[in-house]
Amino acid sequence: MFKMIYNIARTELQMLFYSPVAWLILVVFGIQAGLIFAGKIEGLVVSQEMGYSVAGATFNIFANPWGAVFVNMQNYLYFYIPLLTMSLVSKELSSGSIRLLYSSPITNLQIIVGKFVSMMIYGLFMIGILLLITLCSWSVIKDFDWPMVFVGLLGLYLLICAYAAIGIFMSSLTSYQIVAAIGTFAVLMVLSMIGNWWQEYDFIRDVTYWLAMPGRSGKFIAGLICSEDLLYFILVVCLFLALTIIRLNAVRQKIRFVITLGRNVGVILLVCVLGFITSMPKMKVYYDATATKMNTLTPNSQEIVAKLDGGMTITTYINALDPGASWYAAFYFLKPDMERFEQYLRFKPDMKLKYVYYYDTCANPQLDRRFPDKNLREKMIEVCKMYGLDSNRFMGPEEIRKKIDLSGEGNTFVRQIVRDKLGYEFITICNVSRVNERFLPPSNGW
């Protein structure tokens, strides 16, 4: 079996490099990465000449969210992969050579895995180009952070493999290579953007955020390995390879559509269940590869979190009429806000996050001038129209006051931390819009 997979992978690689497309992609990929790298180096040199500090040069060149090499190349990868995968299966379908494969003692599993292995090897060539750039950086940067860079390269390689698996699946759906390329590009573009879609709906938000790929590799680029992200790429690769095999089996054995559909749904549901399990905080394992452990709480903070035994709930209250940080954790930004607590969830996985949306009196002169004749509810509805939010999800003043009195905080953006250990409560309310923190003692003292 493995020998057959090896033979198929070798044949695919030979055919790939006989084509100018594979060489052209490597050349363009290298030039693009080199130009980005040169721009980052130039910026650091200019900063140094002007007397500014250039601390954290490795991070700034490769992992800084604002235009670093790995970050930019991550965003460009889905332009390259469809051109490589568009012919992997579709050429067999269009030329009729798939019938020759079917007549030989070879399974669809061997065919698909062999083609995927060829793409994995090609992906190593792309990573090799980036490795050459890192070697250039290593020669001029003192205390070069190799572990962080290697983890970033791993994240990009996993992203290439995931894109390749999707491309192989799309290639199996049609005998037209251009259609396969466009279809792959469309799917990859959707998966790159889907993390920002339908964020106002709780269940859909979790699904779309889980499907988004760039955020997964972004953590690797930052030097953090999380078991959830690692298993995510493995699950995505297995999912699309399995769907491809099911598709070819249906064509080869002329299986009924209902049976094929059932198998596809079964595989998708299995991956969803496994994805849900791996995303549970208690199931996550982390490794921070950065030299300064920038993705991890400081030892003192870890010690404080370790002392917080028992359950803990952080409730965030967002007032629709708050002019300051009212949308700091709005529906659209709920997941990014939750990620702010990920370092704490890493060391206290039983911590719970809740969000409460309401409207109440709040100092907002601009809103008062704009809607002088409207009451609180009418103002809230106008604000929801501006932001495209569902006004029915906001509690009224009477309803929120039954839960908690936030008038002491001016009904602005606040977080409430409640511990439920040993029968006592510890409450902290942080006012983000005024950039301060307060400690409100519970009724039985602290």
What is the meaning of each model-derived region?
Residues 282-446:
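Juxtamembrane extramembrane loops of integral membrane proteins
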Residues 1-26:
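Aromatic- and glycine-rich beta-strand/loop motifs that create alpha-glucan
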Residues 65-91:
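Long, hydrophobic alpha-helical segments
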